[in-house]
Each structure stands twice: as C-alpha cells, then as structure tokens.
C-alpha cells in the first residue's frame, strides 16, 4: 500500500500549492518594484536632459535665465538675505530691515509686496499643475467622452445613414403639416368669400324685388315716408322730380298731415280711404304669406334686408328706398286680419287635438304592455318557474360568508384530505 510522495505533505516542500503561491507573489512584487525603479530612473534622465537643454539655452541667450525651483518660496524680505554676508558676521535682521526700507519706495514682485504676487504664475510648474487639474476635472472627462462618441457615430456609416433618414422624415412631416395648414386656410378663405358673395347677391335680389313691388303697388295713392299719410301720385312725382332737403321734406310732410286732418271731417272720403287702406293691407299680407311659403329661411332674409336698408341709406338717397325703410323698420309688426286669426286658431286647435290623441295612444300602449307582463308572470307561477325567481332573490340577498358556511361540510371530509392540495377540488 503506497501512500504516495509523503514529502508533498511537508510545509517546506517547494511543490506544494501554498509555497508556489508565495513564490509567485514574491516574484510579482519584485517585478513591480523593478518597474517603479525603471520609471523613476527614466524620469530622472528626462529631467536631467531638460535641465541641460535649459542651461545650454540660457548660456546661448535664447532663453532668460531661470531661477531655481524652490526660490519662489523664499521671495520677499527674507529672500534677499545673502548668506555669505551672514557668514562674514553681519547681522541679518538689520540687513533685512534695510532692504525692506529700500524697497518700500517701489513695490515689485521680487520683494513679494506687490498685490497678487502670491497667486502669480510660477512658470512650468504652474502649467503642469494646471494641465493635471484639467485632466482630472470630471466635466472635462464627460466632454471628452461625448466627443469620442460623436466621433464614433460620424465614423460609422450605418448610424449616419439612419440619422439622415430620421432627419429627412422629420423634414417631410413638417412640410406636410405646413401644406395641410395652407390648404385649411385657403378653404376657410374660399368659404368666407363664397358666403359673403351669396349674402350680397341675396340682399340685392331681395332689394330689387321689394322695389318692383313698391313700384307696382298703389298707383293712385301712396304714403309719405315717415308719417303714414296718403297723398296723390302727382304730389309724389313732384317730390321725386326735385331733390328736397331734410327741412323741405319735413315741411312737406307737415303740410300733408294738416291737409289730411282737415279732410278727415268729411265721412264719405274717410270711408273710401279706409277701404283702400284695408285692401292694400290684405294684398300685402297675401304677398308676404306667399313669400314665407317660398323662402325656407325668412329670419335670415329679413335680417339681410334690414342690413341692406341700413347700408342703402348711405349709398343712395332715393325716396323709394326711404319709403321701404320707414315702412319695414326692425320693430315693425303688422296687424293680422280676422281671417288669418281664425285660420291660426283652427291650426292651434288641430295641433292640440293631435297631441291629445298621441298621449292617449301612448297610455294605451303602456297599459297593454303591463297587461302582457302580468299575464306572463301568472304563466310562470303555474309552470313551476317561481322557484327560479326565489333562487334569484336568495342569491341577491345572501353574502359570501353564508355560502361558505353552507358548504363547510364539503371542505374537509377525511384525514386523507389533509394530505391533498386544498386548492384542487
């Protein structure tokens, strides 16, 4: 029976795993130290080479002579001390004070008395410090990463193609949106212009029709505009022949008014005037009724006529238009005749009768529906369907707790049920 190499069980054996690990770690440490030493030696060599180049440049005169690296720490009153003089036995404090008194007249960066001399840049060291600070700045690192990513995207043709496609799609969407907005504006403008043209044509048509009717109606007698008085056509023609001012028109109207008052004392003439007035009003009513039946929108036509009349006052001072405007003012309401009142009353009565018949029909229909429902309920109670209704009532009134308590006997019946999953039925 061989137990293998027993030396491997010894702690000092070089082939054990622990000893191999120790040797490897020592070698790694030695290698790291060697690398550090080599790096330091390389830096020293570079620094010496720079110093030699700097010294050679100073000797040649290409560069100004530079002070030692640590001399800036001793600048000021203490930096001007000459150690050789101190060795010769001169008191240093007195010398320092003398130097300070001499330099009080003109401050400079050499004495350290110049404001801001502490924060002044000190050559290459300050530049190196600044560069290291910039490199270690987190914002600078973030910007550097962003620039690298941008450079990667720009160098990647696939991504650039996708970006171009996206930009093109966005531009096309914007152009389509602009075109749609332009089309909508154009349609709105067209609709407005067509509606305004239509309304103006309707106004002109209605104004021409009213003027024709005014010219055809009452050839013998006519009303003076504004006073509701009737004069002969000869007087009216005289008024139309010469353009009258507003005061002359008022005077003419007042004369006609007084003439009509004086003539109203004679009864036969007054009766004839009344009959002609009633006949003219009947003709006008019949014409207005026919116009209502023909036109589908009387309110709009009336409003357009009123607007036309208002604008007509400024456009042309013709007496025909003034008569039309005074007769049909916005607050004008004409009196209905007895025949029209009777006809409207009959229409209202017929409408009320029809409404009453409709109400009775609805009531009868509801009564029939209720009778049919009662009949169906009776049939259900005979056929044994009342149990279904009772079940529905009990289900609506019972709760989940009642149902669980009713079925509690079936939840666990034997000891075997304890071993089964309670979720499975």
Curated annotation (Swiss-Prot):
Residues recorded with modification Phosphoserine: 170, 218, 222
SMART domains associated with the record: Cir_N
Stored InterPro entries: CIR_N_dom, CWC25, CWC25_splicing_factor
BP term (GO), one: mRNA splicing, via spliceosome
Biased composition (Basic residues): 175-193, 251-274, 284-306
Glycyl lysine isopeptide (Lys-Gly) (interchain with G-Cter in SUMO2) cross-link, renumbered residues: 391
Any coiled-coil regions, as ranges: 20-70, 333-377
Keywords of the record: Coiled coil, Isopeptide bond, mRNA processing, mRNA splicing, Nucleus, Phosphoprotein, Spliceosome, Ubl conjugation
Keyword DNA-binding: no
Pfam families linked: Cir_N (PF10197), CWC25 (PF12542)
Locations listed in the record: Nucleus
Entry GO CC: nuclear speck; nucleoplasm; nucleus; U2-type catalytic step 1 spliceosome; U2-type spliceosomal complex
Stretches the record annotates as Disordered: 146-343
Protein task: Involved in pre-mRNA splicing as component of the spliceosome.
Family stated for the protein in its record: Belongs to the CWC25 family.
Subunit structure: Identified in the spliceosome C complex.
Protein name: Pre-mRNA-splicing factor CWC25 homolog
Species annotation: Homo sapiens
Lineage: Eukaryota, Metazoa, Chordata, Craniata, Vertebrata
């Amino acid at each position: 029976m061989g137990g293998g190499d027993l030396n491997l069980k010894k702690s000092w054996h070089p082939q054990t795993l622990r000893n191999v690990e120790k040797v490897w770690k020592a070698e790694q440490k030695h290698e790291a130290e060697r690398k550090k030493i080599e790096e330091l030696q390389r830096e020293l060599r570079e620094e010496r080479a720079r110093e030699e180049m700097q010294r050679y440049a100073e000797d040649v005169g290409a560069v100004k002579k530079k002070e030692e690296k640590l001399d800036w720490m001793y600048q000021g009153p203490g930096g001007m001390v000459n150690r050789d003089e101190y060795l010769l036995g001169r008191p240093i404090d007195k010398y320092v004070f003398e130097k300070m008194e001499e330099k009080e007249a003109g401050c400079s960066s050499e004495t350290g008395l110049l404001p801001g001399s502490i924060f002044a840049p000190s050559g290459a060291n300050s530049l190196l410090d600044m560069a290291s600070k910039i490199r270690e700045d987190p914002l600078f690192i973030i910007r550097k990463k962003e620039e690298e990513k941008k450079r990667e995207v720009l160098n990647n043709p696939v991504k650039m193609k996708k970006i171009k496609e996206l930009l093109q799609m966005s531009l096309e969407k914007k152009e389509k949106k602009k075109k749609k907005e332009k089309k909508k504006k154009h349609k709105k403008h067209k609709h407005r212009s067509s509606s305004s043209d239509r309304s103006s044509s309707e106004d002109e048509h209605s104004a021409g029709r009213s003027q024709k009717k005014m010219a055809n109606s009452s050839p013998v007698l006519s009303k003076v505009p504004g006073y509701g008085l009737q004069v002969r056509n000869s007087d009216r023609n005289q008024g139309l022949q010469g353009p009258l001012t507003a005061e002359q028109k008022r005077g003419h109207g007042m004369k006609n008014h007084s003439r009509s008052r004086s003539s109203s004392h004679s009864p036969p003439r007054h009766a004839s005037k009344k009959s002609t007035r009633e006949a003219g009003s009947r003709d006008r009513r019949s014409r207005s009724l026919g116009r209502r039946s023909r036109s589908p929108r009387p309110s709009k036509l009336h409003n357009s006529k009123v607007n036309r009349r208002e604008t007509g006052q400024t456009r042309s001072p013709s007496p025909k238009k003034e008569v039309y405007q005074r007769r049909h003012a916005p607050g004008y309401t004409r009196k209905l005749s007895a025949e029209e009142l009777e006809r409207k009353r009959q229409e209202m009565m017929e409408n009320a009768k029809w409404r009453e018949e409709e109400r009775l029909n609805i009531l009868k229909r509801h009564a029939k529906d209720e009778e049919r429902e009662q009949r169906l309920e009776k049939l259900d109670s005979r056929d044994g369907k009342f149990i279904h209704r009772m079940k529905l009532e009990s289900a609506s009134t019972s709760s989940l707790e009642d149902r669980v308590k009713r079925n509690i006997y079936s939840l666990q019946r034997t000891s075997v049920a304890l071993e089964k999953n309670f979720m499975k039925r």
